[in-house]
Regions:
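Conserved Rossmann-fold NAD(P)-dependent oxidoreductase catalytic core, especially the SDR/UDP-sugar
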Residues: 96-138
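N-terminal Rossmann NAD(P)H-binding glycine-rich loop of SDR-like oxidoreductase domains
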Residues: 9-30
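Amphipathic terminal alpha-helices
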Residues: 266-271, 278-305
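Glycine/proline-rich active-site loop of Rossmann-fold NAD(P)-dependent oxidoreductases
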Residues: 148, 160-163, 175-184, 192, ...
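Rossmann-fold cofactor-recognition segment
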Residues: 39-53
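Catalytic helix-loop patch of NAD(P)-dependent Rossmann-fold dehydrogenases
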Residues: 88, 123-165
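NAD(P)H-binding glycine-rich loop region in Rossmannoid oxidoreductase-like domains
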Residues: 51-89, 100
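Mid/C-terminal beta-alpha module of Rossmann-like enzyme folds, strongest
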Residues: 197-260, 265, 270-271, 294-299
């Protein structure tokens, strides 16, 4: 059944106390009837409990039109949480949301996934990786594996007549040193507000039962830049992003010597009618105005996904 194109929807956001879930809840509440579901009590959690509470989940999803499923364990948990717990939360939890959604007659699930699941495929030897929906993931961690498994079960259910699904593989979206975050915004980072807008667009996207999109900041780079990005990133930045080069020079920051991957959101731009609006200049503005989203500069190094 297609989603309504204009009337307000009843939407449940899981993981609504988290960074991304909260941003999505706040954005959607401007035009829809939104309730949040999370283990942590907060202003955006109308239902407080765990996804393994089937009765609570059923009540939360009663008469819902759509579910946005953000609740998950993430990369920082890998060193601290057993693999079995990852599967319990990321795979079994997604299955419980799917089952409750199907029972409630939910028509659309938007699943918040991650570009991290591409694993080693994102960083080939000798070149920056060009990462889009056509690239086959090579998962490395339990986080990668469980997000892929959750995607697969949602996609299979949609293909068999269950709720339609839109899978959004989002890039880095958390506080980092300003010089790192600003550079990443060109090729592997995104603002939480742009993530929220992508979810809003995915709610009403027509088309197949299941579709997957890479969600990342707008990139000035082209696929043909990948070899040079790997070995001579400053020269490519001079050509493709002179405003960032000038801003870094003014602040005395070094440019990255190597860029190892580029996430391309082109399919989402074309299909969803979505446009990321908060690029590197917004990162600098947030830093200059002491917004705690952005940390002080470091030497330019950053942890991997």
């Amino acid at each position: 059944m297609p989603m309504p194109t204009s009337s307000p929807l009843k939407i449940v956001v899981t993981g609504s106390a988290g960074r991304v879930g909260r941003a999505i809840h706040i954005r959607l509440a401007r035009e829809h009837r939104v309730s949040g579901f999370d283990r942590t009590p907060c202003s955006t959690a109308d239902w407080v409990g765990d996804l393994d509470d089937a009765a609570l989940l059923a009540r939360a999803l009663h008469r819902a039109d759509a579910v946005i499923h953000t609740a998950a364990l993430h990369a920082p948990h890998v060193a601290h949480v057993p693999a079995a717990r990852f599967r319990q939360v990321n795979v079994d939890g997604t299955r419980r949301v799917l089952d409750a959604a199907a029972a409630a007659g939910v028509r659309r699930i938007v699943f918040t996934s991650t570009t991290a699941l591409y694993g080693s495929a994102a960083t080939p030897d000798g070149s920056a990786g060009w990462v889009d929906e056509m690239l086959t993931p090579q998962p490395q961690t339990i986080y990668h594996h469980t997000k892929l498994e959750a995607e697969a079960l949602l996609r299979e259910a949609a293909d068999q007549g269950g709720p339609s699904v839109r899978i959004l593989r989002m890039s880095r979206c958390f506080p980092e040193p300003v010089n790192v975050m600003a550079a990443f915004r060109l090729h592997r980072g995104i603002d939480a507000r742009d993530v929220a807008e992508a979810h809003a667009a995915a709610l009403r996207h027509a088309g197949p039962a299941a579709a997957t999109f890479v969600i990342s900041g707008a990139t000035p780079f082209l696929r043909e830049d990948c070899a040079d990005l790997h070995g001579a990133a400053p020269a490519v930045l001079q050509r493709r992003a002179p405003a960032l080069v000038a801003a870094f020079a003014q602040r005395g920051w070094a440019l990255p010597e190597r860029i190892d991957r580029v996430y391309s959101p082109q399919r989402a731009l074309d299909a969803l009618g979505w446009q990321p609006r908060h690029g590197f200049a917004e990162v600098l503005h947030q830093y200059d105005t002491h917004v705690p989203e952005v940390l002080p500069p470091n030497d330019g190094s950053a942890a991997s996904d």
